[in-house]
Amino acid sequence: MNVSSACGECETVLQSVSAAVVADESFLETVLTAVLAEGHVLIEDVPGTGKTLTARSFASALGLSFSRIQFTPDLLPGDITGTYVYREDEGTFTFTEGPIFANFVLADEINRAPPKTQAALLEAMAERQVTVDGETRPLPEPFVVIATQNPVESEGVFPLPAAQKDRFLVKTEIGYPEPAAERALLRARTRREARTPAAETVLDADGVRRLQAVPESVTVDDDILDYIVDVVEQTRTDARVEVGASPRGTQRLLEAARARAVIEGRSFVRPVDVTTVARPVLGHRLIRTTDATVDGTGTAEVLDDVLDAVSVPTVRAEDGEAPPTEG
């Protein structure tokens, strides 16, 4: 599959999902960027904004198997990974797969489960395999996790440590729809019998795997690589940041920028691809200083200043395009 074909597939997927989910286009593109880059998504938003529907709709549009794990304080690692069950008639133990064995996994309210259970999910995300009783089992491919958490409630939750947040390619939010979009949501509800809309299936697992291979063919100039390094370095030297983005964050920024270029139908990365994905890719990887937190300085504000402080390179024209003029 070439970039042009991949771009067309991406447009088809977004159209299918947007028919079911009332959300800003940039949010849906951020989730698709993570899927293309073989990453995972953390959605932090209040209840009722469509987090679960988003996960189901993407799984349906992509033709992938889907499972939902409701995280609770009493959830055990085995409830996620699966366990061995003794078969009395056979006199043997048989492994029963847990809900993690799906292409698209929704980890709902991930911060409600204790750290040990969270760690079981994070291991699966990082290694794409699970280990039960010393036996390692690979997870199906493609494998994407969308985890959600509610930013409002603080009682009975176990906040994700920075090291675990770092495993997510992007962190994003849906937000409330515009009044016009919300009216359209109500009109659509009156025209269907089902309580929940469904996205049309437009791909399958093999198609998704071919789609995920395309970003690796996207060209990245040395100037763009330098730009990515400079942006990440700026997060580490900003006085309001105690801990900046890690080298893993640098690599994820590159991967997301390449995926973004594919969505835009380009075979090369432009600076605007980097700036577009920088906030969802880097925001959750920064730890602000105590003073910045007390002052109410958010990571979005820090990243805006970081991007303003770094010189934007001029990339050579390709594919008949005029040279970009960002910055």
Please name every model-derived segment:
Residues 4-41, 46, 236:
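Pre-Walker A (pre-P-loop) alpha-helix and adjacent loop at the N terminus of AAA/AAA+ ATPase modules
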Residues 35-73, 77, 86:
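Walker A/P-loop
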Residues 56, 237-327:
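C-terminal engagement/docking regions of AAA+ P-loop ATPases
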Residues 46, 80, 148:
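P-loop (Walker A) phosphate-binding loop of NTP-binding proteins
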Residues 3-7, 20, 157, 174-245, ...:
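Conserved C-terminal "switch" segment of AAA+ ATPases
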Residues 31-32, 86-106, 135:
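Conserved alpha-helical scaffold flanking the Walker A/P-loop in AAA+ ATPase domains
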Residues 87-90, 113, 117, 127-201, ...:
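Canonical AAA+ ATPase core
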Residues 45, 108-109, 120:
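Walker B catalytic acidic pair
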